[in-house]
Amino acid sequence: MVKVVKNFVKVNQYTRPGLKLAGVKGIVMHYTATPGASALNERDYFNGTCIAIKRKASSAHYFVDRKEAQHIIPENEVAYHAHDKNRCYVSFLKPNANTKSISVEMCVEKDGMIHSETVQNAAELVADLCKRYGLSTNKIVRHYDVTNKICPAPWVSDSSQLTTFRKKVDSLLGNKTVSKTTSSTSQSSKSTGTILKKGASGSQVKALQKRLIAAGFSLPKYGADGSYENETVQAVKALQKKAGIAVDGIYGPATEKALAAIGAKKKKPSSNGKKTSYPLPSGIYKVKSPLMKGTGVRQIQEALAALYFYPDKGAKNNGIDGYYGPKTANAVKRFQLMHGLSADGIYGSDTKAKLKTLLK
């Protein structure tokens, strides 16, 4: 078990407000994004500079490095870690993840990467938390899942790292895990006898969600987020009702057969659930006064949304409104970060080219 050092920061309005949690419903994983800083360095920052100079509402319960875990906020208190812009896209943490979760920050090395020893220490800590609070590993989520912030960045650019981490925690807990990875997500895939139901998560759930959307069973709030929660249950029930089969919200062979039949009748969507084409404007689009607006902006927003970079996920039409405001710029910036482009939130030729490549 990783060495845990209890080293609470002082109660203050910015990093430790002293508010009580409403319960522990999940674990939110983060990374520090401060190359070379140790867990103790982070603890001292949130007990000093962040309060006296930055005056920024930010913190986490635990900071983990290759050596130890610094426990800086009591587990029964709120840490300010995952409520950016009042967002919460994880149903079991709504309406505010800060009040229902414990946060774990992984320190990064000088090269900006998370060391395997740090990941192992984090897994040991999280396994202990899951055991004590009766949490299954599908309650371990990324900051990105909660608010769409690119954190932990290595786990956003490669989502399989979260799956691997969950399996590691399952192993530490002595649980047997079943792989949920499939070799194909096309509409024409054959039934494998897979059963998916509420609480499941991963790439196979995300593939199912994409197929549901393509077949006309919308997921307006969360889209294809890889979590089999109430919205997906209702979409599956709607499919089952339409197909005249047992309505239980559980995806199995009969539901797969029904979905494949409906998908085969769909002529307009492609096999991955996207529109056949996304026209994109030329030129430069950025935030300016007055805001840029019109068809070109809407085309950019629709293309980003097709790749799950929503201007304002959960809002009306997921923020696709034809105005190039801060939220659209943020969606562009997130897209650029994920695909190795200069992350300035400005749409130009490079961003257009990358969008076109991914939407082919």
Swiss-Prot record:
Q: Which reaction does it catalyse?
A: Hydrolyzes the link between N-acetylmuramoyl residues and L-amino acid residues in certain cell-wall glycopeptides
* One biological process term in Gene Ontology: cell wall organization
Looking at the record, the residues that make up the N-acetylmuramoyl-L-alanine amidase domain are 40-154
SUPFAM superfamilies the record matches? N-acetylmuramoyl-L-alanine amidase-like, PGBD-like
Query: Which compartments does it reside in?
Result: Secreted
Query: What general EC class does the enzyme of this chain belong to?
Result: hydrolase
Keyword line? Cell wall biogenesis/degradation, Hydrolase, Repeat, Secreted, Signal
Q: Which GO terms describe its molecular function?
A: N-acetylmuramoyl-L-alanine amidase activity
Signal peptide bounds = 1-39
Question: Which regions does the record annotate with the repeat sequence?
Answer: 166-191, 196-259, 265-289, 291-355
A Pfam family annotated for this UniProt entry: PG_binding_1
Stretches for region 2 X approximate repeats:
166-289, 196-355
Q: What is its main location?
A: secreted
| EC id | 3.5.1.28
GO cellular component terms, alphabetically, are: extracellular region
**So what family is this one in?**
Belongs to the N-acetylmuramoyl-L-alanine amidase 2 family.
| Official protein name in the record | N-acetylmuramoyl-L-alanine amidase CwlL
| Species name | Bacillus licheniformis
Q: What is the lineage of its organism?
A: Bacteria, Bacillati, Bacillota, Bacilli, Bacillales
Gene it is expressed from: cwlL
